[in-house]
Amino acid sequence: MIPTIIAIYLFAVGYGIFRRFNMGLARNSRGQQLRRYLIAAVQVVIPMLLMRQSSFSLPAVCALLTATLWIVTYNVLYDKTNRQTSPDYDNHMDIAFGIYIFGWLSALQGITAALSPAAGIVTGLAEAAILIIPLAHIGYYSVYRTCIDDAGMIPMLDTYASETVEYVRSLGIVKVVFVVAGFIGLTAALVAANWQTASPADTAWWLYAITAAVFAYFTVYIWKPRHGLFVRTGVVNLYIDVRDYFRGSRRYRTGMEQRLSDLSVTRNAEGGKPHTVLLVIGESACRDYMSAFEPDQPWETTPWETAMSRDRRHFSFFRNAYSCAMQTVPALERALTERSQYNNREFSDSVSVIDIARKAGYRTSWFSNQGHIGKNDTSATLVASTSDRAEWTLSSVEAQYDSSLIDFLDTIDPTVDNFVVLHLIGSHFNYENRYPESYAKANGLRTDLGDVECYRNSIHFTDSVLQKAFEKASQRLNLEAMVYCSDHGGIPDMRRSPRFLGFKMVRIPLWTYLSDSYIDRHPAVAKALADNRDRYFTNDLLYDLMCGIFDIRSNRYDPSQSLASADYCYQRADMLTYDNRIRVADDDLDKA
């Protein structure tokens, strides 16, 4: 009876916390987690059944409290911190870890109790160690009134021992003694609770053997280094991301010194008024759902871009553009640098578009509505961090829709040459969270038809953001050139997959804008872009396109790789995607 009650409790608390303290959950995520938590809750009471524990014992209570603290802490604190500023988040690994850790502790207690009542000290110490993270997180929140994030984790990993000692001293001896004594007392209580509990004397040896096997299964599932539950929990995953960012940053910055030491850049057309070149990087936008590229849509999804596509003097829309990869990291680490599918350069050895712009005399600014540090953000963040100015909306108190990026343009100095990058969240899943509900109502967009329609709505909202960026930059910053390109595409009616599921995953929008003054000063570039409208392109050549639009000569730029050059050499048969594995020429086989 007691194992059944515990299973129901763990499932109810876990799923209840998941639904209440996560935002913008996709429909399939709700059902998926319901099934996962139900299966987990059943599995974790198996050790209790094997050890014939039919009543609430102190070890069971301790394990249950440990599990509950893990289930609740990160989700609640993250929600309290981000509910007003983030339209969606799905934190489910702490809940899964909390449920499974109950089974792991129960199995550990059962095994150690068979050896000796005193062996319960192992379980008590394990529980104390496991509680360090949630208790520390609660303490962090009580001091700073915010959930720990990369801004809080970075100082922890980038602090010398002497600085740590100085910080501890600043807290005051009373607080330090209270915290240390409290944790020692908690550890002693957990050890005492597990000390005297022994297994029933008539427990068969084979039940211990099965319990040991269950314990081994839980151990691998929870603690394996690469894909275990523990390394995917909120705080631990954040720690790993920040650690990896520091490692990557050191490599990238070390390589930067070598890259820039021999980088030469010369503008072909000097002089002219201060102006701005604007690059907008989209997210998960597939041109198949954009009216400006594919007019046969259920409703107009890109009203502004469609109108601009008719202005062929200033705008060039490239209808044969593809991404080089299907995920953000491999796509952007190529798009933003020399590295491409067509050379053997390493990311850390490659000059970036920011390097080129700065060397050409532009003041560089990067504004992002994406994450700052994480497995999906690191390469872009490393490039962004070399800008003269880099800011993320995650530090803003406003809701993080892409429209919030427009305000950054008001802070740019119009008296100097500027290169500005806006990195959108675009049409990243979950699509219905990419635009405000008020926007959908104001524009008469359908929101009741599922993922595909919500995806089209996100495309519509991105169109409005592009219009606002264009108008603001034109009015304030003497916009001379603008480029819009997505990192990769997407198939909104299919579950996301690391496998290649069709060319919609890589069909992306690409267009350029040139002002009258730019066309007058750079006629060859303007003619090349117009002449190359129907040429094939993969976005690992975006770096070369931007070099061409800057109209520079450089030892790290080959004009034959740039759509902005009459020497552009690539033909349809040359183009590759999915990290060199798929030929763009095969797109005819998957036109649907």
Predicted segments — roles?
Residues 324-338, 498-552:
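Substrate-binding rim/cap in mid-to-C-terminal beta-strand-loop elements of soluble/periplasmic
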Residues 210-279, 284-443, 538-539, 544-569:
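Active-site-proximal alpha/beta segments of enzymes that process anionic O-linked groups
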Residues 1-234:
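Transmembrane and membrane-interface helices of multi-pass
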Residues 305, 526-531, 550-589:
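Polar, surface-exposed loop/tail segments
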Residues 102, 162, 348-351, 355, ...:
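A structural signal for well-ordered alpha-helical segments within the folded catalytic domains
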Residues 293-300, 474, 478-479, 483-523, ...:
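Histidine-centered active-site microenvironments of extracellular/periplasmic hydrolases
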Residues 105, 264, 406-410, 443-482, ...:
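A long, amphipathic alpha-helix that forms part
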Residues 436-450, 518-527:
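Flexible internal linker/loop segments at domain or repeat junctions
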